[in-house]
Amino acid sequence: TPFKPQPNPNIDMTRSIREQVLQHDKLLFYPYEAMNPFLDLVHEAAYDPECISLRITLYRVAKQSRLCESLIDAAENGKEVTVLMELRARFDEQNNIEWAERLEEAGCTVIYGSEGFKCHSKICQLTYREGMALTRLTLLGTGNFNEKTAKLYSDFMLMTAHPGIGEDANLFFRNLSLGNLRGDYRFLGVAPVGLKPLIMRGLDREIQRALAGEPARVFFK
């Protein structure tokens, strides 16, 4: 029988995903674990009165996308929804154009990235207002927000309430909307300016540790 992605053992699908991420970071490992916690979180946000905005980058989306339907629901429920849709994703151009049109019709703000560059980042941020305070959940992936390919390709998805990562993600989306490629980030490495130097510094650090006989490790996905 075909392999079926399994539930993440650290996530209770009968409880609010938002509350669980606030308590502790969650890591999904596709295709061995199902994408449902992420999809449920976005769906929850679309109907959560405390959620005020949803922002996401989309490179390849499924033709039948539960994620995009939730973004449409969120916009129709009066939330601020911003979508960066990459129209130059090879072989998926028409599908992305069709979803971009549907998202715009629902009231989402759709932007198309910077001239001369493809946006390949996989990042989503949900912002909530609790009284006078704002909280942010940030979702970072190595693969597309795509229900179909998440069952096929090996990728990670981090769901976190880390304040510093949340501030970086907020700045990232602000810079995207302004076409600014030179943001100054504390935790995120963002191409085309900041990612390579960050990686090279990390490699140099581990090289020096290894030369000094100290424990050293490099792990890439």
Model-derived features: positions:
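N-terminal localization/anchoring segments of enzymes in phospholipid and broader phosphate metabolism
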Residues: 1-218
